Amino acid sequence: MILLPAIDLMGGEVVRLRRGLATEKVVYSSDPVAFAKKWEDSGADWLHIVDLDAAFTGEPRNLDSVAKICAAVKIPCELGGGMRSEEKIQAAFDAGVARVILGTKACQSPETIAGFCAKFGGERIAVGIDANGGKVAVKGWTETTATVASDLALAAQKAGAGTIIYTDIATDGMLEGPNFAELEKMLSLLDCNLIASGGVSCDEDLKRLSLMPGLYGAIIGKALYDGRITGNLREIIAAA
């Protein structure tokens, strides 16, 4: 299982939101590169970067910071937030990211997933499925749709997306543990890579995730920033 520390960017700063609410924002740093290097040194396999300004508005606002992060680390980076057109996806790749994450666009126009996969390669396309009570939320989680999360996951896999990132909104930033039941359901449905996001609170959560058969990766956010998980990430899951 690969480990992906999260770097959420807003106005060029590293922030964390509780349940995706902009009103519940904590600013951790004005130096994203320093955190990127810190997580790389801690044993991260990838970095999971989200442009929150773009997620809320649809317009990328933090590509300069993203490019600096990609240039500063040796591990690959993925980027989500505002990836709603070929031009914006290409700009992300030009900034140095290895994989982009489709969210709102994938839900609102699932037929576009296959086109993006054909143009850029399915291994470079992830679909982020942010679930609120089993339904997909979009536009920075400000709107919950009627789309069933598992249906979108299957459609994305069929369209050629190499990776699905499943976020349980109710657990995100709450430090109460991942939604293991929903992850098991997703794993039973999918053959492509599945990354778990939301709720990781301690070493034991990481160990339990690492023991889930077929789980490709786990994103870690608030638990790292708040010091609930310390030490080398690889060593933590090796001890599982």
What are the functions of these language-model segments?
Residues 2-6, 46, 74-78, 98-101, ...:
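Structural preference for beta-strand elements that scaffold enzyme active sites
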Residues 73-99, 181-218:
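Catalytic cores of alpha/beta
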Residues 46-64, 104, 166-176:
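Glycine-rich, proline-tolerant flexible connector loops at the mouths of alpha/beta enzymes
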Residues 28-40, 84-90, 145-155, 206:
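Short, acidic/polar
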Residues 60-67, 142-151, 176-184, 233-237:
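Charged helix-capping and loop-helix junction motifs
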Residues 8, 39, 47, 79, ...:
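Conserved, mostly hydrophobic/aromatic
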Residues 11-12, 19-23, 90-93, 97-172:
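Conserved anion-binding
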Residues 111-120, 187, 206, 210-240:
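C-terminal helical cap(s) of enzyme catalytic domains, especially alpha/beta-barrels
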